[in-house]
Every structure is written in structure tokens, then in C-alpha cells.
Amino acid sequence: VLSRWPIISARVWRLPIGGGVDLARIALGVDLQTPGGPLPVLTTHLSALRDGSWLRQRQVAVLGEALRTLDAGSRRSIVTGDLNATPDADEVRALTGGTSTPHVGMRFVDAWAQTRPAELGRTLDPANPHVSGDVPSGRIDYVLAAAGGAEARGRVRSTELVGVEPVDGVMASDHYGVLARLRC
């Protein structure tokens, strides 16, 4: 987590893994000291197994437990990360309220979908030389803001993809980043 505001606490949660070629996964939760008070931020990288929706759903359930601890009722949480799933996937819909949520009363606004609903916002794109040709393109990286009412929807000011152009001939990653400007 990179922040202009001080990190006042941090905690790590281990996520379930699927075995085989899957890697160990964690969620990192921090509290940022913002002018509006502490801001809980949770970031993660969910399983990349192609047929791993079942596993990512289990991992999202752990995110729900983490949010219960981290958010402590503030309803200000931000969730970011490589979820390795498109917006219509069950694991993403669990966070955005499209299905039952992992933390009762906790639903998130997808910053990209709110500010650019007509744009795909592909963060994984075969046009990126680091992406192998057999990987489907799509938006799998997210900034999600807690949706505690109409006021929360106004927190997301803008979004854009970053890292889409090489610097000195080098791409930063196989994924493009999502930059979201939020009112905190």
C-alpha cells in the first residue's frame, strides 16, 4: 500500500490456496490516518487458477472476515487488488452486491464501473507484451469503495488506467494499473 497519509496499523490475513501450481495468497489490511479519520484499506491478489472461481469465492469470504475486523463499522473501507476475475464473476459480485456479500451490510462500489460505465477498462490485455497470447483480456484489477449510501458513491471522483505505455521501452507489469481518485 502506497499512501501519502501515514499508515497507523497493518495486519495480514492468509487466504486459502488451491494446490497444484497455485501460489500462497494474502490480504494486507492497513489503517491510513487521513484528514477525515482512519481509513481502512485492504489489498490482495486472489488465485489466478483459470477454473478457480470456487477458490476465489472462498478467498473473498476471508476478505469478509478481514473487513469485519478492519472496518469496525466505519463503512469507509477501500478494497484494491488483482482479483483475477471479471466484473460479472461471482467472486467480484459478492463484493459489489450482485450476490450475497461476505460481510453483512458491506457492499462496495466498483470505482471504474461508476466513473466509466461504457468503457471496458481492460487491465489484462494481449496488447501488453508481458501477456501471453492464450490469456483472455478483461478487467481483473479493482479499486472498490465501501457503498454506505449515496454519500459513499460520491467518494469516487475519477479513474484511469496507468502503466499502459512503456517507459524507456519497458512495460511496468503484465497488468495495467487502476488509478482512482477518492474523496476521503
Model-found features: residue ranges?
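Metal-dependent phosphoester-hydrolase catalytic domains
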Residues: 68-77, 85-184
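Structured beta-strand-rich core segments of catalytic domains in phosphoester-bond hydrolases
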Residues: 1-40, 44-46, 142, 158-161
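Conserved phosphate-coordination/catalytic loops
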Residues: 21, 54-58, 134
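His/acidic metal-ligating clusters that form di-metal
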Residues: 29-42, 53-94
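Short, acidic Gly/Pro/Ser/Thr-rich loop/turn segments
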Residues: 9, 48-49, 151-152
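Catalytic metal-binding/acid-base residues of hydrolase active sites
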Residues: 6, 45-47, 83-86, 115-117
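Flexible, glycine-rich phosphate/dinucleotide-binding loops
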Residues: 19, 50, 117-120
